[in-house]
Amino acid sequence: MSPAYPRELGRAFEDDEVARKYRYRQPYPSEVFEILRGLLVEPHTVLDAGSGTGALTIGLAQFAKRVDAIDPSAAMLREARRMPGSDNERIRWIQGTAENAPLDPPYGLVTTGASLHWMDPEIVMPRFGEALAPGARVAIVDTDSIYGEQKWRGEFLTLIRAFSPIAHHITTPDFVKALEASGRFALEGQRSTAPVAVEQSVDEYMAMLASTSSLSRMTLGPRADEFDRQARAIFARHGMTGVRAKVVSGVTWGRPR
């Protein structure tokens, strides 16, 4: 088995507030879709597994013949249907898990956007393999926000470690290595996008954090208000009204086994 996040944390994504706050997550750079377009093969259909609110799905529908967007959360899919472009006739929104949702293969590409670590690779990787068209691949997409040496960052990370129930966040490279070691994935290629500068207000940044499984109000429970208070105090001490970062996305592709 490859590493995965504690499954109980995934319940946060069933919460309407978490789903609403997903809109504050930093978007994928446009270069991600250029990479995915280059990976798509006949019949030019895509399975977007763990689609969430459609951050990948809606972009994929600009060039794929059909995108089957699968997510277990009704709240996420409701929010997805509110997004601009979500009514594209090429998109089919499907509630279910990647392990057991109905599929309509063959697919010219399977994508997972920051979602594969919530799945059981012993089930989904063989399932993806069976659903892929000849020559098609699985693409694992993730995003990293780079804050550099900003003075507030170290203090803020200490605060996150004090409140987050996750002691160690699994990086995508580590996850892919574990998949390879398990024999469930044959790596073929990797690309990273050029950094894209983004800026959010403090309110937007806090809303983005509240959309995560580890720092949502649902997860933090009675500690949520105290986390919010201490976080905003850090920004106030540093005279900050906004948060700047550079966003880099990585696309890793290969064949499931």
PLM regions: where:
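Class I SAM-dependent methyltransferase SAM/SAH-binding core
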Residues: 53-100
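A short, conserved alpha-helix within the catalytic core of class I
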Residues: 119-128
